[in-house]
Amino acid sequence: MELQEVLHMNGGEGEASYAKNSSFNQLALAKVKPFLEQCIRELLRANLPNINKCIKVADLGCASGPNTLLTVRDTVQSIDKVRQEMKNELERPTIQVFLTDLFQNDFNSVFMLLPSFYRKLEKENGRKIGSCLIAAMPGSFHGRLFPEESMHFLHSSYSLQFLSQVPSGLVTELGITANKRSIYSSKASPPPVQKAYLDQFTKDFTTFLRMRSEELLSRGRMLLTCICKGDECDGPNTMDLLEMAINDLVVEGRLGEEKLDSFNVPIYTASVEEVKCMVEEEGSFEILYLQTFKLRYDAGFSIDDDCQVRSHSPEYSDEHARAAHVASLIRSVYEPILASHFGEAIIPDIFHRFATNAAKVIRLGKGFYNNLIISLAKKPEKSDV
């Protein structure tokens, strides 16, 4: 089975769907919104071609469920707020939004939400239906998605860690797995495996930057948010917990060791310095600002986390309930690729053990994601300077 067929979130609206388990991302979007407004402010001041008539934006790796339209809402609100601050008396521009993700993404679940979204946008923002046009653009952001110099603003949230393929070189010339008992480039992985993952990320991220520079107008903006490498004190990350859960099943005899050794997740968490250096080396973009922030990986569990998300009764608000919440989120993201390799029957057992391990981390007050926000501007051509 092709990687792109299984590298997607759980669709639909069931209990294991991404739509029902993406409150962490909702909280993260709230943290990013001030940076989004600043990025839009700089974009409108740059006075790009046609920007007062139609602003073309895209969400790269939009996934599915209500969070997809939260990103659109925040972008539209930021555009209208900044134009008001600038006392722009011209008629509001049309906003054309492209939602992009791999072909297997559940775009239909997003389309079902559009009628109510448009009505709410008209009621709360005064935007008449037709002044914000939303369409899907299926495809991989590791290749071209839009015509040359056609876009004003590009946004991506928690997608860049996914690689275009599992790195090559993870099996030796003798057919021996180089990344034994690991499922990604972890601290325990041997140096050749870590290098293979870094090389693949470097290739993919450099290609991503080059493709986006071709699609953006000169001085167009891009805002990226992603997980980045954290500190030792953050505790094991969720990929470590997933790896531990699968290893537990191997020890119990529920899974064969060879099944684990042949499984490698196409994901790489870069360091801040790695991302910064790659942007500078590719050369198409200027870094306007770069900032990190931490979130617990059980963030979004309750409304006490500064976000309007589903709440839980106090008697269940302990580390076990929080761990189950984290397990549901990770399952909604990785179940398709796990099921394609290990089979669907073992999935509940994997995430039961995941939750058990996560509870131990949460009890110790650990378990953090380090998040990176980076705002980029496409460098002007010499003829534009």
Curated annotation (Swiss-Prot):
<dbReference type="InterPro" id="IPR042086">
    <property type="entry name" value="MeTrfase_capping"/>
</dbReference>
<feature type="binding site">
    <location>
        <position position="67"/>
    </location>
    <ligand>
        <name>S-adenosyl-L-homocysteine</name>
    </ligand>
</feature>
<feature type="binding site">
    <location>
        <position position="263"/>
    </location>
    <ligand>
        <name>Mg(2+)</name>
    </ligand>
</feature>
<comment type="similarity">
    <text>Belongs to the methyltransferase superfamily. Type-7 methyltransferase family.</text>
</comment>
<dbReference type="InterPro" id="IPR029063">
    <property type="entry name" value="SAM-dependent_MTases_sf"/>
</dbReference>
<feature type="binding site">
    <location>
        <position position="62"/>
    </location>
    <ligand>
        <name>S-adenosyl-L-homocysteine</name>
    </ligand>
</feature>
<feature type="binding site">
    <location>
        <position position="369"/>
    </location>
    <ligand>
        <name>caffeine</name>
    </ligand>
</feature>
<keyword id="KW-0479">Metal-binding</keyword>
<feature type="binding site">
    <location>
        <position position="264"/>
    </location>
    <ligand>
        <name>Mg(2+)</name>
    </ligand>
</feature>
<feature type="binding site">
    <location>
        <position position="162"/>
    </location>
    <ligand>
        <name>caffeine</name>
    </ligand>
</feature>
<feature type="binding site">
    <location>
        <position position="158"/>
    </location>
    <ligand>
        <name>caffeine</name>
    </ligand>
</feature>
<feature type="binding site">
    <location>
        <position position="179"/>
    </location>
    <ligand>
        <name>Mg(2+)</name>
    </ligand>
</feature>
<comment type="pathway">
    <text>Alkaloid biosynthesis.</text>
</comment>
<protein>
    <recommendedName>
        <fullName>Probable caffeine synthase MTL1</fullName>
        <ecNumber>2.1.1.-</ecNumber>
    </recommendedName>
</protein>
<keyword id="KW-0808">Transferase</keyword>
<keyword id="KW-0460">Magnesium</keyword>
<feature type="binding site">
    <location>
        <position position="101"/>
    </location>
    <ligand>
        <name>S-adenosyl-L-homocysteine</name>
    </ligand>
</feature>
<feature type="binding site">
    <location>
        <position position="18"/>
    </location>
    <ligand>
        <name>S-adenosyl-L-homocysteine</name>
    </ligand>
</feature>
<feature type="binding site">
    <location>
        <position position="238"/>
    </location>
    <ligand>
        <name>caffeine</name>
    </ligand>
</feature>
<comment type="function">
    <text>May be involved in the biosynthesis of caffeine.</text>
</comment>
<dbReference type="Pfam" id="PF03492">
    <property type="entry name" value="Methyltransf_7"/>
</dbReference>
<dbReference type="GO" id="GO:0032259">
    <property type="term" value="P:methylation"/>
</dbReference>
<feature type="binding site">
    <location>
        <position position="261"/>
    </location>
    <ligand>
        <name>Mg(2+)</name>
    </ligand>
</feature>
<keyword id="KW-0489">Methyltransferase</keyword>
<feature type="site" description="Involved in substrate discrimination">
    <location>
        <position position="267"/>
    </location>
</feature>
<dbReference type="GO" id="GO:0046872">
    <property type="term" value="F:metal ion binding"/>
</dbReference>
<feature type="site" description="Involved in substrate discrimination">
    <location>
        <position position="155"/>
    </location>
</feature>
<feature type="site" description="Involved in substrate discrimination">
    <location>
        <position position="344"/>
    </location>
</feature>
<feature type="binding site">
    <location>
        <position position="102"/>
    </location>
    <ligand>
        <name>S-adenosyl-L-homocysteine</name>
    </ligand>
</feature>
<feature type="binding site">
    <location>
        <position position="141"/>
    </location>
    <ligand>
        <name>S-adenosyl-L-homocysteine</name>
    </ligand>
</feature>
<dbReference type="GO" id="GO:0008168">
    <property type="term" value="F:methyltransferase activity"/>
</dbReference>
<dbReference type="InterPro" id="IPR005299">
    <property type="entry name" value="MeTrfase_7"/>
</dbReference>
<feature type="binding site">
    <location>
        <position position="140"/>
    </location>
    <ligand>
        <name>S-adenosyl-L-homocysteine</name>
    </ligand>
</feature>
<feature type="binding site">
    <location>
        <position position="161"/>
    </location>
    <ligand>
        <name>caffeine</name>
    </ligand>
</feature>
